[in-house]
């Protein structure tokens, strides 16, 4: 199998995203390796050794995705027995011309601390944790968005992702069996109607997920899951709460759709 | 100010990472906009209108970062009054040649659900939540890593990030004032010594953070913060627990360093 390396003198997150996006266009398998924080000659030489070994082992040159712009370690990496792809390079000169500014390559800028957005994110994570799963219903004033939905429809991971990635304060509140007889927006959520965003999920997927947690229970029964999904969707429609179906969506897609539909501003860029 | 647009028929996360990495090389400010899920002609035309307005408003052509490969909406976007940057394009033909395979562009592949890694991540988030802050000390068998450190040194956001991004099960355990008189590894953590990873932080930064939460308390006093930091660092050294100082690091950098130092495998690629 062909090896793919994502390498950088920083976190290598940019190289990973770049490499994955490109390789995902090709219907074949790769062996993935990330090497972060190549900041010294020693580390660059160690990386070179790993890459060269992968090439010998695989019989075909490893693919190396990197973002070194001007760096003495770049030469070491470029001397590897591998095919190199640097996604910044083709764009730097055209952008310099367009902006009429010279690029100033500084390592660690993309995924390092930018004071303001950092504090936002930590605060948002704390907010998501203390306002998870209806555990605190007195602090919705502070929320940017309040996710609602039945148990296991994706509320908690989505709230945390909104906080960690975007610094958005997302509370979440679950509709449970007790609410179902006459499902309505609870009184403490009413003043925040405009912040509500609904998640729903296909009943069959919900049955499967709940069955994995509590097999043969009322909670995971087909009858219960179908009823809960039907009731919340009715509520969303009657109360004009925007909602999405999370069945086929990743956390990244759920949160990107929430941002698109609500127009919420991300604090981190 | 020049406008920068990150657009895609998917989440636009790849466009954002690509655009930010490039623009971070230039010492100037931009107005950032993300437009996700451009899946229809209507949405492409609406995006075009927003982009053209930004160009008129700013007096200079907006910068548009996108990853459309083969797509009918691409033509609409390419007809905008803007400068376009497509980071996949320069690399597709060389990679096709190297791999001797034709690229098969499929939208939504990079940040959509890959069944296996999706379940890992949700499970890991649940694990991080139930094993946060020492709230459960009976389930460390299942942990991939156990973060330790004083209160407010970055354990919780790092655990959640490891779970959400990489599907890694990270528990975390806080050393508090009660532990300080004779700081040692608690008995329930001893069997998992090899999973321990320490976080530390500069005392002054710790004072500032704690002061923001509980001003004028023993918890946030200079004396207390200095003592706690000194004691945990002594423990890490005596017990040979690998550790990093999080003071100047973002969550992305902390977790990338943890992966590098522990050699932990990420479940998501």
From Swiss-Prot, chains A, B:
Q: Which reaction does it catalyse?
A: [pyruvate, water dikinase] + ADP = [pyruvate, water dikinase]-phosphate + AMP + H(+); [pyruvate, water dikinase]-phosphate + phosphate + H(+) = [pyruvate, water dikinase] + diphosphate
Q: What are the entry keywords?
A: Kinase, Nucleotide-binding, Serine/threonine-protein kinase, Transferase
**What are the EC numbers?**
2.7.11.33, 2.7.4.28
Give this protein's Gene Ontology molecular function annotations. Answer: ADP binding; ATP binding; phosphotransferase activity, phosphate group as acceptor; protein serine/threonine kinase activity
Instruction: Answer whether the UniProt record assigns the keyword Iron to this protein.
Output: no
InterPro entries, A to Z: Kinase-pyrophosphorylase, PSRP
Pfam families annotated for this entry? Kinase-PPPase
The EC category is transferase
Protein residues bound to ADP: 149-156
Task: Give the UniProt family note.
Answer: Belongs to the pyruvate, phosphate/water dikinase regulatory protein family. PSRP subfamily.
Q: Which HAMAP family match?
A: PSRP (MF_01062)
Which NCBIfam families does its entry note? PRK05339.1 (NF003742)
What is the protein's known function? Bifunctional serine/threonine kinase and phosphorylase involved in the regulation of the phosphoenolpyruvate synthase (PEPS) by catalyzing its phosphorylation/dephosphorylation.
Q: What is this protein called?
A: Putative phosphoenolpyruvate synthase regulatory protein
- What organism does this protein naturally occur in? Colwellia psychrerythraea (strain 34H / ATCC BAA-681) (Vibrio psychroerythus)
